UniProtKB/Swiss-Prot annotation:
Annotated gene: YPT35
Protein's name according to its UniProt entry: Endosomal/vacuolar adapter protein YPT35
UniProt keyword annotation of Membrane present: yes
Domain PX, first and last residues per copy: 73-213
Gene Ontology cellular-component annotations: endosome membrane; vacuolar membrane
GO biological process, one term: protein localization to membrane
PROSITE patterns given in the database record: PX
Length: 214
């Protein structure tokens, strides 16, 4: 983050039910409009080929996408946000991102531990992530651009509301809708095995644990 920030208030705004730590992912319902999802390492799966020549694997109830030899992405959880102070009296929301990992090796799986990555991101970080993913696809394999569609992010504040930007952007209902949109976006990305394989370095950099500035 470019701004020098201080976290206020001490406790994050709760936008989610704390009991719902493993939300149900409804990716199939939006797959037709958003592009294919590929997955692996699941017990209940069916596969078919799409028009782009890629294999789509539908799995229930678990999906995962390999990030390295040891772990696969299992799901992402965008939870409560914290309102922070930036320069010049501005305020913005920082989201807590938790990505759950599934061990690929029996040695890790036998430990029955919960493997996860946790970091903090602003909406603008998601915007840059999407831009970087699109640039990578266009540069590396432009013919795959239609097959590896990147879902849209939840909208930013509309121009006609810019005069009350702070009020709109920090509204709890607005933030709750943004949380759901960011969570869908991130899950769509990390559960697409073809996309992960092509953009692994970009995703790893995005998920690098953040240092919170007091």
């Amino acid at each position: 983050m470019n701004d020098k920030i201080s976290f206020l208030p001490p406790e994050p705004i709760q936008l989610l039910d704390e009991d719902s730590t493993e939300p149900e992912l409804d990716i199939d319902s939006q797959q037709e409009n958003e592009g294919p999802i590929s997955a692996s390492n699941s017990n209940d799966s069916t596969s078919h080929s799409n028009d782009c020549g890629a294999t789509i694997t539908r799995t229930r109830p678990r999906r995962s996408s390999s990030i390295n030899a040891n772990f696969s992405f299992q799901k992402a959880h965008v939870s409560d946000c914290t309102i922070v102070n930036g320069d010049h009296g501005t305020k913005f929301a920082v989201w807590r991102i938790t990505v759950f990992l599934e061990p690929n090796l029996k040695a890790f799986a036998a430990k029955r531990e919960s493997y996860k990555i946790q970091t903090y991101k602003r909406y603008s970080d998601f915007v840059r992530l999407r831009e970087n993913l699109l640039t990578r696809i266009k540069t590396a394999k432009p013919e795959k651009l239609n097959c590896l569609q990147i879902p849209h992010l939840p909208p930013s504040v509309q121009w006609y509301s810019s005069w009350k930007y702070q009020e709109v952007n920090l509204n709890k209902d607005w933030l709750a809708k943004r949380q759901r949109g960011l969570e869908y976006f991130l899950n769509h990305i990390i559960l697409n095995s073809s996309l992960v394989e092509m953009t692994k370095d970009i995703l790893i950099q995005f998920l690098e644990p953040s240092k919170r500035v007091a």
